[in-house]
Amino acid sequence: GCAGFTILFVGTTGEVVVVGGGSVGLDVVEYFAPRGAECTIVDMLPQIGMLADPITKCSMRETHDKYGVKEYVNTALQEVKENAFTVKLPDGTIEDLNFDLGFNCLGMRANNPILVQLEEAFDNTDTFIYPIGDSVRARRIMEGTMDGRAILNVLDARGFLDL
């Protein structure tokens, strides 16, 4: 995923292709489009930013219209190449979307390969294992933010935030 991307980008006429029209994908486009990149955003859903709140949707539409962002909806990622994403268009056509910078901002599957071992290793100790984010299940940024807040509450309750 793209969450927390940090890139120094001064400006270019290069191609930026983003796969995933959720919050993070929209943030990537919002960063690069005003800096001169030719942006394309791809999503499997019938609308870019479909799950976004109304204010985000309005801002997105304004940015995409102002900077000529190309949108591919009902379009599925098939392959990631060094300088292109291969996608399947709604009519079944396979197409390469070439990029100078490509971002995979898809919702992913939960990834917690060592969670059981960690829980076993720290069983009967005062260490609490608290799975968060996509280690629990693939989900939205808001839920990850709520997890972060819950962790702060646990740390505060145990006195670890008293600085």
Language model segments and positions:
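Rossmann-like dinucleotide/flavin-binding elements
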Residues: 1-51, 89-163
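Helical element adjacent to the flavin cofactor pocket in flavoenzyme catalytic cores
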Residues: 60-69
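A conserved short coil-to-beta-strand element within the FAD-binding core of flavoproteins
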Residues: 73-84
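Conserved N-terminal glycine-rich FAD pyrophosphate-binding loop of Rossmann-like flavoproteins
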Residues: 47-61
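General small-molecule cofactor/ligand-binding pocket signal
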Residues: 70-72, 130
